[in-house]
Amino acid sequence: MERPSFLDQEPPAGYVPGIGRGATGFSTKEKQVVSNDDKGRRIPKRYRENLNNHLQSQPKDDEDDEAANVFKTLELKLAQKKKKRANEKDDDNSVDSSNVKRQFADLKESLAAVTESEWMDIPDATDFTRRNKRNRIQEQLNRKTYAAPDSLIPGNVDLNKLTEEREKLLQSQIDENLAQLTKNASNPIQVNKPNAATDALSYLKDLENDRVNSLSDATLEDLQKMRTILKSYRKADPTNPQGWIASARLEEKARKFSVAKKIIENGCQECPRSSDIWLENIRLHESDVHYCKTLVATAINFNPTSPLLWFKAIDLESTTVNKYRVVRKALQEIPRDEGLWKLAVSFEADKAQVIKMLEKATQFIPQSMDLLTAYTNLQSYHNAKMTLNSFRKILPQEPEIWIISTLLEERNNPDIPVDKLVSLLKEGLLELSKNGYKATLSAWLKRAEALNDAPNSNLTCQAIVYAILEWLRESGEYESELNNVDQILEKMPHSKVQIAVLKKLIQWDPCDTVLWSRLKMATESYHKIEELLAFFQELLFQTKNSDDIRANMREKSPGLLMMYVSEYWKAQKGDTRQTLVLIDQIIDFAPHNLDLRFFKIKLLGRSLQLDELRDFFQQTFSSLEDFKISGTERLYYKYVNFLRYQDLNEEAIKFLNERCLKSFPICHKFFLQLGQIYHSMGNIEMSRETYLSGTRLVPNCPLLWVSLSKIDEIDLKNPVRARSILDRGLLKNPDDVLFYIAKIQMEIRLGNLDQAELLVTQALQKFPSNALLWVEQIKLFKHGNKSSLKKTIFQDALRRTQNDHRVLLEIGVSFYAEAQYETSLKWLERALKKCSRYGDTWVWLFRTYARLGKDTVDLYNMFDQCEPTYGPEWIAASKNVKMQYCTPREILLRLMNDK
């Protein structure tokens, strides 16, 4: 086809393409030039013509051309600078990029070693922009539901076909799960079936736990699914009762009781030989007792040897006569059931019939030790021994028969010695070992623990422990069995068995203080402290080797004798006469035990037997004169205090100068006593001279320096010299914190609180964890006005001293001073829990109880058990010569009345 010629021609003037075909959307008018002023604003039409005429009429001059050239030159220069800057920037970017390439070159090369799995594990980059808002919107959209018409479902989807495929899939899964179940069900002999009906049994357990709960929280679909599964179980193995029981419990849970009963009835027809399904049927009909009796009778006809069904039949009967009748019928069917024989014995009132019944029961079940024990308990002593002898032949490896024999001997003769019972049990262990029985310590201790609370078994329990320990030791198995006895003792509770084990071990090693301490704790916890004292008395004076035991205890463990005397005195509730008799008895074979003599001195002083006390001192001096015994200076110290108690100061001074200081010239206690005697007599100069000579001979004793400084400060009113004395003592003992404390207390007494605070700060820098310094720091708050820092100081003190009981006490005292008694009580109880032997804590605790009006009976009982011994305030009272023979309770009352 030839090209049309008009396509190569020029269009006519005013030609607009498409306008002939009716095209629209464009203007056919000629575009007008829009006139604007210099600032870009549109010029109105009425001024345009005049403006054009004016511009055309105005001629161009050279200045305009020159200005235009200048501006053009400037624009060229600016353009060149801009271009140069861009080139430099590109060069910098190229350099930076090259540096980056070189920096990451090795990393790029290592990418070759990345495996495919590592590459896939690299997390994808996620968009965190407005993530929370997007998630919130998405959650809102997910919660929205919309109603959709059926027309939206495509017509080519076959719903019936889809349902059939789902049912096929579910059926295949059920068949796979039931494969093992069907296999096990078809096997008539199954000793152990851990995998049989596992799913059904687990589901049964869940239904049993939630049987009382409704299915309100389960959907209809889940309920139908469970029904389908259980139906498949029943269909696969209709003779398995677990499927029927599970289905019935499911319907029971769904509150469809009639359906559940119908299912379980069908199950009873399918599985009449299963006692479980009959019991489930009885449970579902438990409201109808008469029908339950019918069911249990039918069940017993099918299962006459099921003990559970017979026990259920017994429970359904309401009268004892009917119960006994059912029990007798059950025994005809199951004569070897121990529980039925026990029920029969409990229902029988005639003793003769019970004996006959137990005789028959032991013939059917000779291995039942409970029936044998009940049988021998009703027999006479002679007949019981014959019965046990016959059973030893039937059961030659049964150790319980020998234990029953021991109980029989104890019941027949309550005063029988333990040694005879031990011999009987050891004979039994020998016979058992001949028949292949191997005795173990743990097994026999468990047998003893089983008799721990049984009546008339105390001697037998002890004999079992003694017999097994002696048997293991004599049979050569001591190392293998008894090496772990400590671990066994730690796991055992405080009981008669533990006490018996400890007593036997102590008999083998009477000087073991650890075993004695354990025995003391066990007897105290079990409230058998008199048993500890009787055992002590037996070892020391009543056994064949008592002389050897006393000698070993005197040489190796003299503290055990003191423990015996102390516990005896507590048990006698302060009976001084009986305790003094015991002390004299022990002193006869342990004359050099000073602790016993000190205890006797304390008892004679508290009972105010001063003449006997003076005679005892003289007798002690004469008996120990030719022996060098450690602790003699304590004896002299107590004698000086005894003289001071009677105001025999001159005699005390003479005794100190002629005997004490000559025998012990560097004992600081004698210098302190001598100085205190002179001070009490008003001879201040001699008192100061005594302390001064003491500091020269014993310069490392801070008490002498402190006593000397107090003479100058308080008595001689010379605080400057007192400070100098403490400074000299500190120079000779730079690491003794007591000098800092003495200086701080002196400044507080003198009213120099700033100086005292400075000394505390200096001392804490050197001894940051010393509790006594922190106590002084807390005491300064009572004299100053820095209560705002109190909490901070408390926290620092507790942290640095690790909650020391003295710091806890001082915090409680500070709250007591502010009348915050409840808060003070809490801190004082914490301090007491931390250390119960600190006497000052008890004093302030009783003061707080008095302020709060609380009952102190229990607190006094705790106080009597603890017997506090130290604390500044407590020692100041207890070491007072006029109060040295006071009881702890008397000292407590005196201190409580002081404030």
Curated annotation (Swiss-Prot):
Q: Does the keyword Repeat apply?
A: yes
Q: Where is the signal peptide?
A: none
The HAT repeats are at 221-253, 255-287, 289-318, 319-350, 352-381, 383-414, 493-525, 545-578, 608-645, 648-680, 682-714, 751-783, 819-851
Q: Which GO terms describe its biological process?
A: mRNA splicing, via spliceosome; spliceosomal tri-snRNP complex assembly
Q: Which UniProt keywords apply?
A: mRNA processing, mRNA splicing, Nucleus, Repeat, Spliceosome
> Out of the domains of life, which is the source?
Eukaryota
Q: Where in the cell is it found?
A: Nucleus
| Main location, first listed in the record | nucleus
* Composition-biased stretches (Basic and acidic residues): 28-51
Naming one, the record's GO cellular component terms include: U4/U6 snRNP
Q: Residue ranges of region Disordered?
A: 1-65
Subunit organization:
Component of the U4/U6-U5 tri-snRNP complex composed of the U4, U6 and U5 snRNAs and at least PRP3, PRP4, PRP6, PRP8, PRP18, PRP31, PRP38, SNU13, SNU23, SNU66, SNU114, SPP381, SMB1, SMD1, SMD2, SMD3, SMX2, SMX3, LSM2, LSM3, LSM4, LSM5, LSM6, LSM7, LSM8, BRR2 and DIB1.
Further remarks about this protein from its record: Present with 2250 molecules/cell in log phase SD medium.
Q: What does this protein do?
A: Participates in pre-mRNA splicing. Part of the U4/U5/U6 tri-snRNP complex, one of the building blocks of the spliceosome.
**Protein's name in the database:** Pre-mRNA-splicing factor 6
Q: Which organism is it from?
A: Saccharomyces cerevisiae (strain ATCC 204508 / S288c) (Baker's yeast)
Taxonomic classification = Eukaryota, Fungi, Dikarya, Ascomycota, Saccharomycotina
